[in-house]
Amino acid sequence: MSEMITVGDAIARTLEQYHVEAIYGVISIHNLPIADAVGQRGNIRFVPARGEAGSVTMADAHGRFSGLGVALTSTGAGAGNAVGALVEAMNACTPLLHLTGQVEKAWLDADTGFIHETRDQLTFLKASSKRAYRISNANQAIAILQDRKSVV
């Protein structure tokens, strides 16, 4: 029987394979599965930021000097707060991975004002990044992260 892993675990394990040393971010209810998996594994340092733009700016600097920079932001308005810094990193061709959560599937794209929901988050992330994906399971997370074009 194959091992069942969460999306958060899949992300943490794959980032370790890329020798990611640090994730810069803001913790929120919708990205806790990723943050928890990273914390439980203990191989990647979490560097807290005061805001999402700051987390992406720190990841941008890390990417420019040391390889892949990784930012973890809140969903919805939090991810929106990261947009300016994402555009800067994209224009500089910085190797950067921005991770954010999403609202529960029952509320996804419902446009009801559910906590941290924003209308069509994926579209504004596509406009401010080289690529953006909505991940729905661990296998999809692994496949996207292992495709080098998705990560840099």
Where are these regions (language model features)?
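N-terminal alpha/beta PP-like core and its mobile active-site loop of ThDP/TPP-dependent enzymes
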Residues: 1-152
